């Protein structure tokens, strides 16, 4: 069974035991998080929400917090000999899906 959930403004397709990386969530390592914004649950009898499925939730456990690789943003203006280089590192939370409930 799989589910499509919304976490951090993005959609993820998850199964039991899968590991996902979402935008940083304020939760301690080892705690369980419940997602109730579920768009679809697939399997033998798929269900599609309008926009969400009522009384369904996905349970995930926080594995770690970290930071992604640095992304460089480079801007250049022609003929001015002007340029700007900026770096960005996004914080993330690693989650392991432990269950999908209807």
From Swiss-Prot:
The keyword DNA repair does not apply. It comes from Lawsonia intracellularis (strain PHE/MN1-00). SUPFAM superfamilies: L21p-like. One of its GO terms (biological process) is translation. One of its GO terms (molecular function) is structural constituent of ribosome. It comes from the Bacteria. Part of the 50S ribosomal subunit. Contacts protein L20. This is Large ribosomal subunit protein bL21. Belongs to the bacterial ribosomal protein bL21 family. This protein binds to 23S rRNA in the presence of protein L20. One of its GO terms (cellular component) is cytoplasm. Keywords: Ribonucleoprotein, Ribosomal protein, RNA-binding, rRNA-binding. The keyword Oxidoreductase does not apply.
